[in-house]
Amino acid sequence: MHVVIINGSPRVEKYSNTEKIIDAFAEGLAKAGATFERYTISSRKNWDMAREAYTQNTEIIFALPLYVENIPGLLLEFFETLPIKDNNTRVSFILQGGFAEASQLECGKKFLEKLPKYLNVSYGGTLIKGDNFGIRVVSKEDVLKITGPYQEMGKGFVENNGFKAEIVKKFSGPDYLPVPMRIMIQIMFKTIARKKFETVSKEWGAKVPIDYRPWQ
């Protein structure tokens, strides 16, 4: 199997959580004996190469972040430039986001399920997983803990010939977190997590508090 992976995030590679997820997933592909090539669309200068790879290959995976229940506008623009193919080409998706509950990604998943029909290609499934926000703010060791499971999904993609519904469901985690856990998370965000975000914001160059409201 030879797979073309296209990172549909508008964020540059250096700061892209999606790119780090692709790193792990691609390792899994390689472990299962597959080959792959990778492209990003955050810079329009890469579009011609990515489009050519899409045109010349039949196993395509788009990896993307969830933005406000839908996919990035830049990726939609890229889709509009793609040529019409046939169902010999299979398109699959990796949809990731910061929300911990799988239900938060369902709207985006439903859209992606319909998209291959408009591209005139076959659909290979959508792997969804939330709770990925921390990838950008934690240590390298902790990043590997978050992205490590994607390596197994890459291996499974080859061995199972695509994303299988039962595996996707198990990987995505709970649709809704239990009430006690929600309460605990709310407390964490008001205490430990808040301090962490304050530290990170200063490291990123923020000059005002994280709860600053310039419109007031």
Residue ranges and their predicted role:
Residues 126-189:
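A conserved mid-domain beta-alpha-beta active-site/ligand-binding segment of alpha/beta enzyme cores
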Residues 84, 118-121, 159:
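Alpha-helix capping at helix-to-loop junctions
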Residues 91-145:
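Short, glycine-/small-residue-rich phosphate/pyrophosphate-handling segment
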Residues 87-89:
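A glycine-biased structural micro-motif
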Residues 38-44, 74-77, 92-101, 125-133, ...:
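Low-complexity, flexible helical/coil segments
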Residues 1-85, 162-216:
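N-terminal beta1-alpha1-beta2 submodule of the flavodoxin-like/Rossmannoid cofactor-binding fold
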Residues 96-109, 125, 152-164, 186-205:
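Short flexible/disordered coil segments
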